[in-house]
Curated annotation (Swiss-Prot):
Record protein name field: Holliday junction branch migration complex subunit RuvB
Database matches in SMART domains: AAA (SM00382)
Gene (UniProt): ruvB
Function: The RuvA-RuvB-RuvC complex processes Holliday junction (HJ) DNA during genetic recombination and DNA repair, while the RuvA-RuvB complex plays an important role in the rescue of blocked DNA replication forks via replication fork reversal (RFR). RuvA specifically binds to HJ cruciform DNA, conferring on it an open structure. The RuvB hexamer acts as an ATP-dependent pump, pulling dsDNA into and through the RuvAB complex. RuvB forms 2 homohexamers on either side of HJ DNA bound by 1 or 2 RuvA tetramers; 4 subunits per hexamer contact DNA at a time.
SUPFAM superfamilies: P-loop containing nucleoside triphosphate hydrolases (SSF52540), Winged helix' DNA-binding domain (SSF46785)
Species lineage: Bacteria, Bacillati, Actinomycetota, Actinomycetes, Mycobacteriales
Similarity remark: Belongs to the RuvB family.
Ranges for region Large ATPase domain (RuvB-L): 4-204
Region (Small ATPAse domain (RuvB-S)): 205-275
Entry domain remark: Has 3 domains, the large (RuvB-L) and small ATPase (RuvB-S) domains and the C-terminal head (RuvB-H) domain. The head domain binds DNA, while the ATPase domains jointly bind ATP, ADP or are empty depending on the state of the subunit in the translocation cycle. During a single DNA translocation step the structure of each domain remains the same, but their relative positions change.
Organism: Corynebacterium efficiens (strain DSM 44549 / YS-314 / AJ 12310 / JCM 11189 / NBRC 100395)
């Protein structure tokens, strides 16, 4: 794609490697602004028809919800899997909206004891949607209580301690559980089997991400050229959350250094300022590649070693960086550890050694 030059007052800041302190549930790190969380809520689609991308999941989910409404019953429990930022939380909100019911939200780490889950379940109304994010991190006592709740719509509450403890059955109204996970392999078999519908959220292609960028620009009332929307989409790592975040940062740049309208030149210049390269890799991604290639000769290297090298938590490297780097053909996961491909070497401006994966 042709690059348009755009002068940046004060010059372009140098790229730096190192830790970013990113949370595994966020993607383009250091450029998160205080109003971003509120903005993401505002930008969420409110129906399956508004939801862009994931056509297979949308069609399947539409059948599940429509069939349940026609029968007058609550839909089967839903499990949504996939990397962060692909719309799992949004899809849970849409399910509640499509059913015309309330959405109750919590997360796996918040359910440390069975009592935490019992309190939430006892407050549900008939037909409510209960959304548990990071459901793979739910504590075992709460998970075991969830089995009965999902299957029989009742729980057993233990009153007292020791030999005098008694179990009191508590009926709960029929509800639909929507679980979201970035690590479906960490779910136990009994929990996974209780979901009637499971869906894998896939990375977006550039065409769908361009539609996301244009829709967001309309909502934010920002003018944007078509080629600028494509450029932002192509650097968004296949992830709508990143596309929206990059658009807001490009908007900031255009308002400060131009007339507020986003051109291709403004988009390119802004993305350089915010350290996002042509493939959508940011500082942490390049730090991982640099540690793997320059620090360990291309690998194989374990994820814990890589995390120490870049100053991040292993979960951040594994859940945020790796999915896209593997998809982009930069890293191969082997039984002995992570290995840099020829594409990773060349992306860093280095010639890959003979025999490197992907060097044809």
């Amino acid at each position: 794609m042709e690059r348009t030059e755009f002068e940046i007052p004060g010059g372009i800041p140098p790229r730096r490697h190192g830790g970013t302190g990113r949370d595994p549930d966020t993607s383009v790190d250091a450029n998160i602004q205080p109003d971003d969380v509120e903005a993401e809520v505002t930008l969420r689609p409110r129906s399956l028809d508004e939801f862009i991308g994931q056509p297979k999941v949308r069609d399947q989910l539409s059948l599940v919800l429509t069939g349940a409404k026609k029968r007058g019953v609550v839909p089967d429990h839903v499990l949504l899997s996939g990397p962060p930022g692909l719309g799992k939380t949004t899809m849970a909100m849409i399910i509640a909206q499509e059913l015309g019911t309330s959405l109750r939200m919590t997360s796996g780490p918040a359910l440390e004891r069975a009592g935490d889950l019992a309190a939430m379940l006892s407050n549900l109304m008939e037909g409510d949607v209960l959304f548990i994010d990071e459901i793979h991190r739910i504590a075992r006592p709460a998970e075991e209580m969830l089995y009965m709740a999902m299957e029989d719509f009742r729980i057993d509450v233990i009153v007292g301690k020791g030999p005098g403890a008694t179990s009191i059955p508590l009926e709960i109204p029929p509800f639909t559980l929507v679980g979201a996970t970035t690590r479906s392999g960490m779910l136990t078999g009994p929990l996974r089997d209780r979901f009637g519908f499971t869906a894998q959220m896939e990375f977006y292609d550039v065409a769908d991400l361009t539609r996301v960028v244009k829709r967001t620009a309309r909502i934010l009332e920002v003018g944007i050229d078509a080629d600028a929307a494509v450029e932002i989409a192509s650097r968004s790592r296949g992830t709508p959350r990143i596309a929206n975040r990059l658009l807001r940062r490009v908007r900031d740049f255009a308002e400060v250094h131009a007339d507020g309208h986003i051109t291709l030149g403004a988009a390119n210049a802004a993305l350089i300022v915010f350290d996002v390269d042509e493939l959508g890799l940011d500082r942490l991604d390049r730090a991982v590649l640099d540690a793997l290639v320059r620090g360990h000769g291309g690998g194989p290297v374990g994820v814990n070693t890589l995390a120490v090298a870049v100053g991040e938590e292993p979960a951040t490297v594994e859940e945020v960086c790796e999915p896209y780097l593997v998809r982009a053909g930069m890293i191969a996961r082997t039984g002995r550890g992570r290995v840099a491909t020829a594409a990773a070497w060349r992306h860093l401006g280095l010639e890959p050694p003979e025999g490197t994966i992907g060097d044809y």
